[in-house]
Amino acid sequence: MSDGETLADVRIVLIGDEGCGKTSLVMSLLEDEWVDAVPRRLDRVLIPADVTPENVTTSIVDLSIKEEEDNWLISEMRQANVICVVYSVTDDTTVERIQEKWLPLIRQAFGEYHETPIILVGNKSDGTANNTDKLPSGQSLVSSLQILPIMEANTEVETCVECSARTMKNVSEIFYYAQKAVIYPTRPLYDADTKQLTDRAKKALIRVFKICDRDNDGYLSDTELNDFQKLCFGIPLTSTALEDVKRAVADGCPDGVASDALMLAGFLYLHLLFIERGRHETTWAVLRKFGYETSLKLAEEYLYPRITIPVGCSTELSPEGVQFVSALFEKYDEDKDGCLSPSELQNLFSVCSAPVITKDNILALETNQRGWLTYNGYMAYWNMTTLINLTQTFEQLAYLGFPVGRSGPGRAGNTLDSIRVTRERKKDLENHGTDRKVFQCLVVGAKDAGKTVFMQSLAGRGMSDVAQIGRRHSPFVINRVKVKEESKYLLLREVDVLSPQDALGSGETSADVVAFLYDVSNPDSFAFCATVYQKYFYRTKTPCVMIATKVEREEVDQRWEIPPEEFCKQFELPKPIKFSSSNIGQSNSPIFEQLAMMAVYPHLRRVFYLSDSNLLSKITFGAAIVALAGFLVLKNL
């Protein structure tokens, strides 16, 4: 059951033998006094949230067995969040039927290993038998010695409460415990057999510890503990309370405290103490603050917040998102060398559900000579995923703890603040400017046109590096590029088509700029580019450029109607740019700057056509405007 359901509704089902007082218990709760005349069975009772201690709407269902079949009972029980098995402390038979009838029936409903909490309710503890024969004071016919073995043998039984509908003893407590059993269940957290935290509880709490360990030293200092306390509960701990916590941990867990700070083992032990002392709500308050549902999985709304991206818009990291991921790099770059080693990278993403940056997709990013991720490559990764896979960005930021601290105590928040939706491209064109930071360049070319070498050059990798890359690698490469002294991110995306007749997807045709690569030594290479251009990009507003590769080889005539230079002139494209050996491995190559320039200023396509390709990297934005104005004047003469 999700947290949303828990907070909205708790469904309590009462079962047990006839005459145990199930209906009387509900009537006493409703009337706040003993009711002599009770109906045979009550319909569903709804208790509003504002009259319950946990502020949850609660429904109580009284199931009678006299006239109902087991199948019907099972169907009703399956809708329950918690089941109260009522027996009479004045009748041994009703106790025996707990194991003979009721617990097996519950397992039929939920399965052999279920997590629906069960509460045993011993009614009629006021000391009457059949409402006539008085029992000795303080003595019940059913002793705890009969109930304890049942609880020990059935771990789904949360607790046992003796009560009396007649004297009102523990009546309200029963339903309070039932609510708590749903909202703060024990079984996901605690293994009754080993008397230890469950593996999934440990995993969740380890994530919490790592997020709260701001300096990544493996300890929670007093400052970090107090920040944790204020984050989860809204109030700080006094210095005395802090010392009491550390003393309690040190007494029971010798490895839990070191250098006057709480270690991971101590943090886990502290929550074990909470649970053993019946303070499950404390641990659950922490877990829910960090996004966990009752299943100890992160909530869907926490991982994947709803967002609408209008057509023509894209997504980028917001300033808050940039600050958060940048701080993570600083936190986990233990040797402060400006790179993340494999162990540092693994440590950073250890709280995520799956490996994030693998050997394959690291080829899309800038690394140092040892293959370690640089700060620039790390930031480029986040910009890439936010543009092409926003869901992945949301999920990873949630696991890394982005929303924590951005909402009130007890609330997990979401990752929406980590991103910004850019203005529609159409508006950018109309306004002759954009505030976008990330731009996508489609790389199109026939097989062996040199696309891999070209793309990997943006990440600073040369021929020897490319030679070690397998055939199956990331189709993306991203890096930071300067556009008139302003940093932008250029994302190259290879189009994997075997022939120009292959269809391109909408995501591919909506790029900011397109680079068509052709091998000057292959007579059939340019035809591929020309065909794709005419089929998908002619008469569009997407800037395009032809790039000649392997220019050191002997140039041959291309098997196309007209040469590449004439083709570009005919379709008003910039002259073909030569990608030579001097450009290989150079992330700061003017070619990448030109691609970024064309993506940032698509409204200046005419300038790109009129200007020499080398001139493009030299002109200022103002000069480009002048050139465009000059063209318009000439056109209108």
From Swiss-Prot:
Gene Ontology molecular function terms on file: calcium ion binding; GTP binding; GTPase activity
Annotated GTP 2 binding sites: 445-452, 482-486, 549-552
Protein residues bound to Ca(2+) 2: 333, 335, 337, 339, 344
Residue numbers binding GTP 1: 28-35, 74-78, 135-138
Domain of life from the UniProt record: Eukaryota
Domain EF-hand intervals: 200-235, 320-355
Protein keywords: Calcium, GTP-binding, Hydrolase, Membrane, Metal-binding, Mitochondrion, Mitochondrion outer membrane, Nucleotide-binding, Repeat, Transmembrane, Transmembrane helix
Positions that bind Ca(2+) 1: 213, 215, 217, 219, 224
Broad class of where this protein is predominantly found: mitochondrion
Any Pfam family hit: EF_assoc_1
EC numbers: 3.6.5.-
One GO term of the biological process aspect: mitochondrial outer membrane permeabilization
Transmembrane segment boundaries: 614-634
Family classification: Belongs to the mitochondrial Rho GTPase family.
Function according to Swiss-Prot or TrEMBL: Mitochondrial GTPase involved in mitochondrial trafficking. Probably involved in control of anterograde transport of mitochondria and their subcellular distribution.
Protein name from the UniProt record: Mitochondrial Rho GTPase 1
Organism annotation: Caenorhabditis briggsae
Gene: miro-1
